[in-house]
Amino acid sequence: GWGFDAAGFDAAVDVDPAAGLRLRLTLDAAGQFDITQAALPESRSEWRLARAGVPLLSTDPWLTVKSTNRAAYDSARTALPEGIDEVVFVNERGELCDGSITTLFFDRGQGMRTPPLSSGLLPGVLRAELGCPEEVLLAQDLPHVRLWVGNALRGLIGAVWVG
């Protein structure tokens, strides 16, 4: 692991937990950290989802760790079409993965599920908190499932697939 000055971090962070801010800690291999904070944007009660234009490779190890190596996600987020709140990535096998800033959840009528880590996605905090069973979701399944997206900052948000 990397060394980290926890006391220095505690001294550098002066945030009211009730403020509803996004706090981001970036740590490098030398143990140096950078802290940024920003207000969370207002969120709708239902997000409109579309497919990301670039497929992911499920074996890419960078998909399984929270890092700054996220060019595909950032590009897709920057290029969101009008009326779309989130894009969902598909891997080389046609399996749905993550959104650009969210985890995908779905229900076929048997309880909430989430795509398996083997599809190539981040084991996010919300995903761990909800403890949903994993199940492969293909694009052709989308008209037949109830959808949600979410993350640790925004919680679980109802979603509709618009393509």
What are these regions (language model features)?
Residues 1-22, 26-163:
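Helix-start/capping segments and mature chain N-termini
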